[in-house]
Amino acid sequence: MSLLTVERVSRRFGSLVAVNNVSLSVEPGELRAVIGPNGAGKTTFFNMISGFLAPTSGRILFESEDVTRLLPARRVWRGIARTFQVTEVFPELSVRENLRIATEVAAGYRRRPWISREADAEVSARVTDLSDMGGLSDKETRPVGELSHGDQRATEIMMALALKPRLLLLDEPTAGMGDQETYNITQLIRQLHKDHKLSIVLIEHDMRVVFHLADRIMVLAEGAMLAEGTPPEIAANEMVQAAYLGKAA
């Protein structure tokens, strides 16, 4: 049974068709990549999966349940978490405080005026684990806004992981990074995928990252699916070469 099934979704903004009749199926534990030129509809597609936009037509199933009209928070509770093109963190708070907020949200504690000592200890232990997994333990007392772009992105990814998702959506996780930061984030994604058996769908422009990580790749162009296949199949696809990979080269 597929974890995520996107059935023929479209999104129109007036006369503009941003996403046109796109389908996608993601299996448990699979790592998918979505690529395409700027303006291909990738982020709009993500926004529909995560609930920030409603499709004009089509439907979205998560674990066979129709979530097409669910709000983003409801989808988080179902097991869908995401990061954004522009890193979404609390820059004035420390790494640890950011991770604690996400952990408390996942546990339902943010809606309570107080929590027990035992619960507080569990949250603290979970935050420490997240910090260690993200390679952030030596920076966890620093404000996130003072960190490098790569460490800010790692913080955001670990905040998403704190929500205990079964599906993690990563929107251009290495955008704006140099080679070392790109390598670090790529290794982090690979390790999280392996250790937590997560299903991951990522949007990415760096083809080194895509071909290193993805089990399968979907190519969007002008809002429609141009091709789908394994990394070798996509690399050899002449239509993809003409529309995207050839330009990137």
What is each residue range found by the language model?
Residues M1-A249:
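Glycine-rich phosphate-binding loops of nucleotide-dependent enzymes
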